[in-house]
């Protein structure tokens, strides 16, 4: 039971490592993809990287860094403050969540949002998860309209 309670899926671990990479990239200025290989290699050297889905990590990290300007453009209308005022953690989580919503329709929108919320609970500020949930929920309604409308309401 203890092992199950502490276990996280390989995809969740991949998202956690991707967030660390996006965070490092944002701290370096958050422009271009020239640092992607170095960030990727550094994170793969982490002791517990073997617990992560390496392919999903690569997809997320490199995809987010490549698509960041477009991703930001899509979530900007839904944030309640200037982009510069977002913490690097919230910014990184929104980039990852937006990337999943926009480029990976095989991941159900509720899963993409929930995974981003879990990242925010683990790594973000006190109520950061509420902010992330609200922004990604609005983005999902825009980019996954049919899926959101077809989902049963609680």
UniProtKB/Swiss-Prot annotation:
Keywords, in A-Z order: RNA-binding, Transcription, Transcription antitermination, Transcription regulation
InterPro entries per UniProt: NusB-like_sf (IPR035926), NusB_fam (IPR011605), NusB_RsmB_TIM44 (IPR006027)
Any one Gene Ontology cellular component term annotated for this protein: cytosol
A single GO BP: transcription antitermination
Organism: Bordetella pertussis (strain Tohama I / ATCC BAA-589 / NCTC 13251)
Entry protein name: Transcription antitermination protein NusB
Domain of life of the source: Bacteria
Listed PANTHER family: ANTITERMINATION NUSB DOMAIN-CONTAINING PROTEIN, N UTILIZATION SUBSTANCE PROTEIN B-RELATED
SUPFAM superfamilies listed in its UniProt record: NusB-like
Family that this chain belongs to: Belongs to the NusB family.
GO molecular function, a single term: RNA binding
Function field: Involved in transcription antitermination. Required for transcription of ribosomal RNA (rRNA) genes. Binds specifically to the boxA antiterminator sequence of the ribosomal RNA (rrn) operons.
Database matches in Pfam families: NusB
């Amino acid at each position: 039971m203890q092992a199950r309670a502490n276990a996280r899926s390989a995809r969740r671990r991949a998202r956690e490592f991707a967030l660390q990479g996006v965070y490092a990239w944002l701290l370096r200025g958050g422009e271009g993809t020239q640092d992607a290989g170095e960030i990727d290699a550094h994170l793969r050297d982490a002791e517990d990287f073997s617990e992560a889905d390496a392919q999903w990590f690569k997809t997320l990290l490199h995809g987010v860094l490549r698509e960041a300007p477009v991703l930001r453009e899509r979530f900007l209308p839904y944030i309640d403050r200037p982009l510069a005022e977002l913490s690097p953690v919230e910014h990184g989580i929104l980039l990852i969540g937006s990337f999943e919503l926009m480029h990976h329709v095989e991941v159900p929108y509720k899963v993409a949002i929930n995974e981003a919320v879990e990242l925010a609970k683990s790594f973000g500020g006190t109520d950061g998860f509420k902010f992330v949930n609200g922004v990604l929920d609005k983005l999902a309604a825009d980019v996954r309209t049919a899926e959101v409308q077809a989902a049963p309401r609680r």
